[in-house]
């Protein structure tokens, strides 16, 4: 049996903190306004994993009203979601993440993001795709006010 999940996340820029995307620190003059580290890529991917198995969403499991998640590394959240996937008897078929940002440029960091995600999901880097695009300077992402990310996860029942 296979299951497919979709995830979405968005964060605005505005805090003096490191910019973390896909588990990688991306050099930029500002970070995200967020309760956790604000990693939009891992948040969308976490939601995709949870959605594939009807396990709710990131806000249900890790509410931003709970101080234990304040400034938490989003890799911890992703790994916990994946633990739940494994508990249900599934493994990764593949994941695909799309980062929508005018700035900063993602291309130099994509290979590192893929490696981090593959490590956390205990799969091959060939099962992880990360790509980036812009909105051609349209909307808040086009004005470099923040970043949007979408993710899809295909889960396969373990034998």
UniProtKB/Swiss-Prot annotation:
Q: What are its cofactors?
A: a divalent metal cation
Which residues does the record give as 4-CDP-2-C-methyl-D-erythritol 2-phosphate binding sites? 9-11, 35-36, 57-59, 62-66, 133-136, 140, 143
Using the UniProt record, name the top-level EC class of this enzyme in a single word. lyase
Which residues does the annotation say bind a divalent metal cation?
9, 11, 43
Cofactor binding mode and count: Binds 1 divalent metal cation per subunit.
- GO terms, molecular function: 2-C-methyl-D-erythritol 2,4-cyclodiphosphate synthase activity; metal ion binding
State the pathway, as annotated in the record. Isoprenoid biosynthesis; isopentenyl diphosphate biosynthesis via DXP pathway; isopentenyl diphosphate from 1-deoxy-D-xylulose 5-phosphate: step 4/6
Catalytic activity field: 4-CDP-2-C-methyl-D-erythritol 2-phosphate = 2-C-methyl-D-erythritol 2,4-cyclic diphosphate + CMP
GO terms of biological process kind: isopentenyl diphosphate biosynthetic process, methylerythritol 4-phosphate pathway; terpenoid biosynthetic process
Enzyme Commission code:
4.6.1.12
Domain of life, per the record?
A: Bacteria
Name the keywords, alphabetized: Isoprene biosynthesis, Lyase, Metal-binding
What Pfam family does this protein match (any one)? Answer: YgbB
Q: Where is this site: Transition state stabilizer?
A: 35, 134
Look up keyword Metal-binding and say if it applies: yes
Reported function: Involved in the biosynthesis of isopentenyl diphosphate (IPP) and dimethylallyl diphosphate (DMAPP), two major building blocks of isoprenoid compounds. Catalyzes the conversion of 4-diphosphocytidyl-2-C-methyl-D-erythritol 2-phosphate (CDP-ME2P) to 2-C-methyl-D-erythritol 2,4-cyclodiphosphate (ME-CPP) with a corresponding release of cytidine 5-monophosphate (CMP).
The UniProt subunit note reads as follows: Homotrimer.
- Name the family: Belongs to the IspF family.
Query: Which protein, by its recorded name, is this?
Result: 2-C-methyl-D-erythritol 2,4-cyclodiphosphate synthase
Q: Look up and give the organism this protein is from.
A: Mannheimia succiniciproducens (strain KCTC 0769BP / MBEL55E)
């Amino acid at each position: 049996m296979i299951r497919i999940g979709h995830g979405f996340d968005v964060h605005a820029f505005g805090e003096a903190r490191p910019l973390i995307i896909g588990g990688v620190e991306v050099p930029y003059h500002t970070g995200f306004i967020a309760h956790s580290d604000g990693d939009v890529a891992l948040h969308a991917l976490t939601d995709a994993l949870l959605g594939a198995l009807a396990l709710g969403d990131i806000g249900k499991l890790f509410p931003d009203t709970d101080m234990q998640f304040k400034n938490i590394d989003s890799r911890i959240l992703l790994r916990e979601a994946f633990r739940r996937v494994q508990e249900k008897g599934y493994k990764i078929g593949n994941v695909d993440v799309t980062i929508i940002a005018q700035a900063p440029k993602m291309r130099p960091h994509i290979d590192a993001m893929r490696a981090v995600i593959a490590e956390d999901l205990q799969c091959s880097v060939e099962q992880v795709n990360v790509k980036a695009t812009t909105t051609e300077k349209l909307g808040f992402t086009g004005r470099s006010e923040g970043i949007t990310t979408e993710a899809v996860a295909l889960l396969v029942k373990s034998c």
